[in-house]
Amino acid sequence: MAGRAILIAGPTASGKSALALGLAQARGGVVINADSMQVYGDLRVLTARPSPEEEEAAPHRLYGHVDGAVNYSVGHYLADAGRVLRDAWAAERLPIVVGGTGLYFKALLEGLSAIPPVPEAVRAAVRAQAEGRETASLHADLARLDPEGAARIAPGDRLRVLRALEIRAATGRPLSAFQGSRQPGPLAGVACEKLFLAPDRAGLRARIDARFLSMMEAGALDEVRRLRARHLDPMLPVMRAHGVPGLIAHLNGALTREEAVARGQADTRRYAKRQVTWFRHQVGEDWRWLTPEEAAREFLPGH
């Protein structure tokens, strides 16, 4: 199996996990997560992580292994994914990388800029200085310090603006100075079968809405209640997962349950649209776009 992998991408609720599990069972594979929210242990239900029964049916890696208090970066993911890929090949298992986070796939295939880590004290200081300020104002600061880097970041993208300011504060150098040098990705030179699941739009919207209701029935609100009790920084990725802000607003009395559900459904539908758009413009022509039904017929005959 060394030097081979299957990559399965697609929007949320497109059936990626079911296809990955079926392939892992049929081909002796190991399922490797490529979803930036499913890494967090706090949100099994709300991020639609594989169930314990599914995880027992085939090996699964990089699911729920990160605490919600951690700001888990693409660099962290790349290091973890490189390790589990090597372990899979050493065990003669086929890696099946599945998820909807485009930057994870891009980093696996193309590598990542060699940006040094930012000390936590520096990160905290930058965020404390930024608290209460508009993102556009922070972006203007960045434009003065790093015009080239600021030009690559939307003025409203607070997380990326803060990240660039943190790097400047930690290293004394602009983010753009590091973006020319790349460390190769662990899938560089690997024979990869690349699949993108693309359901029809109406069907996907219906699945997203129905799945959110199922999540509520399965305990999503209790999950968010436990997360809220931790009093984490609202800027952390886990606190911005689809459904979390609306359900916290409901727990705080600002939204009804029905309003929180509607917000979670709408946020997830918008995210799915962005996922499709990103992949359409960012990945190469060697990715095969299939409907979930086409993929099942081709790769899981008899299922």
UniProtKB/Swiss-Prot annotation:
EC number: 2.5.1.75
Catalyzed reactions per annotation: adenosine(37) in tRNA + dimethylallyl diphosphate = N(6)-dimethylallyladenosine(37) in tRNA + diphosphate
This protein's record includes keyword Zinc: no
Keywords: ATP-binding, Magnesium, Nucleotide-binding, Transferase, tRNA processing
Positions of the record's site feature: Interaction with substrate tRNA: 101, 123
Coiled-coil stretches noted in the UniProt entry, renumbered to this chain: none
Name of the featured protein: tRNA dimethylallyltransferase
Organism of provenance: Methylobacterium nodulans (strain LMG 21967 / CNCM I-2342 / ORS 2060)
Lineage: Bacteria, Pseudomonadati, Pseudomonadota, Alphaproteobacteria, Hyphomicrobiales
